[in-house]
Amino acid sequence: MKTFALFLLTPFLYAQQLTKKYIVDGQTKQPLSSVIIHDIHNYTLTNEDGYFFFHASGDTITIKLLGYKTLKITPEQLNREKDTLFLDPKPIELSEVVVGSNPEILSQVYRKALDNYPNEPFVEDFFLRCVLKLNGDFLKIEDIAGRVKRNKLLGLSKDIKIDFQLLNMRKFGIENKDKYSEDLALLSLRDVFLWYSSLLFLDYQRFNFSAPTIVDDTHKKINHFPKNNNFYDGVGHLVINTKDYSIVERSDKINDAMIDKIPWNKKLWVKFRTSYYSLKEKCESSSNGKYFIASACLTQQVEVHNKAQKNLYDIEYQLVITRPFSLISTFKPNVNAKAELFKLNIPYNKDFWEKQNQLPLTDQMQAFIKNAHNQKGYRIISNF
């Protein structure tokens, strides 16, 4: 087989209460993914099916998603609610006008960056889910709970120092036994987290920007577009908090008009290329006044052509920061940050995974794990 690539917990002030709920759009009744649920200590997200588990440890729980009205509720009220929660949409944003380079509000964002984002060493507790699919079918699922230490949040890759302390892991995958089949490697921890830290400062020489559009009474949105047609400058948007000029949401994806111009790489009898990528991030303010990346999702699609067939690999890396700015003195790095993710080995802790509250396995994931043993021609790779 040929491979190619592209806690120490602070004491709680309140007794924890475990809650499982389902969140939908109040109008369409469709499930909402990536809804942020947090209290003073903990953060989590809804999964693709709209479900979440949450260990409440404070007196107020906030449930929020940009474009929807924020819901604040006590743990007791949340437990009394029915299984389904409804979020009501806010009014639709106004239409945009393209104005060119350097809108004033973006200049304000850059001037306030040192005030809004950590620029000295800090530690965060995180949960990372990695999913690899081949032609729409699951190949690998990996969930990691750990801690990350960085010298600063944003900057060029060469300027960011990053280490990891992994605490818990569960991974499950299947691998084709045919030695001539290809195997797509996942990114390393370092590479994934550097993607998350790379998109705040956009070069005015390379991008045009739309005029700000109103999202709600405290947020405006700016779209960005590459000035020149190339395959490495993407399109996307920034959502800006107009009270402190922080960025609360960022997105960037491949310029669809340039997909056909993306070059192919070749290795032996295989040629491949990244034909799609998308990065979405949401930022929150912590009690220390600094913003952190509360959640992020990086998706990639890789086309692979071998002698027998054409394959599409879809990869997703979903991040949740479960505790921002945690205790730095207890951080102990224990893994190689440059190692490929699925090659990392941390023993499976059944008790932890039965009680943890981050990104529940979707129905499709559970079916994949249950039925994988019935697939002929594949070997199973798992730590549980």
Language-model regions, residue ranges each:
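Bacterial Sec-dependent N-terminal signal peptides
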Residues: 1-22, 384
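Short, ordered, surface-exposed loop/turn motifs in non-cytosolic proteins
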Residues: 19, 27-40
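A short, amphipathic beta-strand motif
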Residues: 19-26, 50, 85
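A short, solvent-exposed loop/turn motif at the edges and junctions
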Residues: 39, 63-73
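Short, acidic Ser/Thr/Gly-rich low-complexity loop/linker segments typical of extracellular
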Residues: 42-51
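Short Pro-Gly-centered beta-turn/loop motif in secreted/extracellular proteins
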Residues: 53-60
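Surface-exposed, low-complexity/disordered segments
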Residues: 86-218, 263, 268-384
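Extended beta-strand-rich segments in extracellular/periplasmic secretory proteins, especially
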Residues: 195-254
